[in-house]
């Protein structure tokens, strides 16, 4: 496990470049800071300043090396690097509320932006006019879209929103996509077609995060009522739901076809598995508890406490987890959704942690990634 404290401010979101030498983070404001790995240090090498509202989403395309950002200013920008300088291109989102989330498609020829305008902007590059344009998916979304994830076929798009529902839409754009093959989610995929809908008003909560499995047949999501759910399209859209005893989870991602990692307000990542019988099970918290020791507080810590907690005393508010506040995002660091070897978390404590499954397996008895 390696933990790096970037900031005192929360890290809103992050994204890695292809070779994992650079990470782009938003320090809870209108900027994106890019840090480069230099030995054991992370050195700030770029600041992207074009938004005039809080940045809410970052994604870094591994093949084309382009960054897309979105923010509360209702804008999205595609950033391309030329001669060592990042240049922004404005995207026409056509929304009247804040953008909340952004994600490149697997082929990197389009991206999707969720927003408070109760719609999803699917954006693609129009070469004749040399600009990024968008098409809207509106119905039947009834509230803010909080999270998105692309199916491996580059066409289907999962969305979690504040109306307690998780939906799968077709984001097929004839200008850039080849006609998609049939999937367990359906065969006819005109743009905006809703392929599936899960959840309801009677139960559930805001859907904070969604994730397709590597095959695209399974879809996981976490809600504000502390539930983890998995829908399996290959099993007639059957849904398995696990009501956990934990605080709400904010981020979820598949780390193998049947295992997923989720994290949130409990400040540590957790492993869940989904078996062939359609049963969803909590396996373990993936944290190594710190040894609590009594010690004298240094002058440096006294000043840090004044900044962080508005107090000069050491009241032993330190959590036993590595992260000292809620985890806001989980991402794969080494490997992919078929076989993840390391994953990364960032949180409100301004820290970034890289977790190694091999190290975790040696500490946690009986831990195996299925």
UniProtKB/Swiss-Prot annotation:
GO biological process, any: Arp2/3 complex-mediated actin nucleation
Tell me where it mainly resides: cytoplasm
> What GO cellular component is one of the record's annotations?
cytoplasm
Keywords noted in UniProt: Actin-binding, Cytoplasm, Cytoskeleton, Nucleus, Repeat, WD repeat
Spans of the WD repeats are 6-45, 50-89, 140-179, 202-241, 244-284, 322-365
Q: A Pfam family in this protein?
A: WD40
Extract one GO molecular function annotation from the record: actin filament binding
Supply the SUPFAM superfamilies for this chain. Answer: WD40 repeat-like (SSF50978)
Q: What does this protein do?
A: Probably functions as a component of the Arp2/3 complex which is involved in regulation of actin polymerization and together with an activating nucleation-promoting factor (NPF) mediates the formation of branched actin networks. In addition to its role in the cytoplasmic cytoskeleton, the Arp2/3 complex also promotes actin polymerization in the nucleus, thereby regulating gene transcription and repair of damaged DNA.
**Assembly, per entry:** Component of the Arp2/3 complex.
Family of the protein in this entry: Belongs to the WD repeat ARPC1 family.
Q: What is this protein called?
A: Actin-related protein 2/3 complex subunit 1A-B
Organism whose genome encodes this protein: Xenopus laevis (African clawed frog)
Q: What is the lineage of its organism?
A: Eukaryota, Metazoa, Chordata, Craniata, Vertebrata
């Amino acid at each position: 496990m390696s933990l790096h404290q970037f900031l005192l401010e929360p890290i809103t979101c992050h994204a890695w470049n292809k070779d994992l030498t650079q990470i782009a983070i938003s320090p809870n404001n209108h900027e994106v800071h890019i840090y480069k790995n230099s030995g054991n240090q992370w050195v700030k090498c770029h600041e992207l300043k074009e938004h005039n509202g809080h940045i809410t989403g970052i994604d870094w395309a591994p093949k084309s090396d382009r960054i897309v950002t979105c923010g509360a200013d209702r804008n999205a920008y595609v950033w391309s690097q030329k001669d060592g300088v990042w240049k922004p291109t404005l995207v026409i989102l056509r929304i009247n509320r804040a953008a909340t989330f952004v994600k490149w498609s697997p082929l990197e020829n389009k991206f999707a932006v969720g927003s408070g305008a109760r719609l999803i902007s699917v954006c693609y590059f129009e070469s004749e006019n040399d600009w990024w344009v968008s098409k809207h998916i509106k119905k039947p979304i009834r509230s803010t879209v909080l999270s998105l994830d692309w199916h491996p076929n580059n066409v289907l798009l999962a969305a979690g929103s504040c109306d307690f529902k998780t939906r799968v839409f077709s984001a097929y754009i004839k200008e850039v996509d080849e006609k998609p093959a049939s999937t367990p989610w359906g065969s006819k995929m005109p743009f905006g077609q809703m392929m599936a809908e899960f959840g309801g008003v009677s139960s559930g909560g805001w859907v904070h995060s969604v994730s397709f499995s590597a095959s695209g047949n399974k879809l996981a999501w976490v809600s504000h009522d502390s539930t983890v759910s998995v829908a399996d399209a290959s099993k007639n859209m059957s849904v398995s739901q696990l009501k956990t005893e934990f605080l709400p989870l904010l981020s979820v991602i598949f780390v193998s076809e049947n295992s997923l990692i989720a994290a949130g307000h409990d400040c540590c990542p957790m492993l869940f598995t989904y078996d062939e019988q359609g049963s969803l099970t909590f396996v373990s918290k993936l944290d190594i508890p710190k040894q609590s020791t009594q010690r004298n507080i240094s002058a440096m810590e006294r000043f840090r406490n004044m900044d962080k907690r508005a107090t000069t005393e050491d009241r032993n508010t330190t959590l036993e987890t590595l992260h000292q506040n809620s985890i806001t995002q989980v991402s794969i660091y080494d490997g992919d959704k078929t076989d993840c070897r390391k994953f990364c978390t960032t949180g409100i404590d301004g820290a970034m942690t890289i977790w190694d499954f091999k190290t975790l397996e040696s500490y946690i008895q009986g831990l195996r990634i299925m």
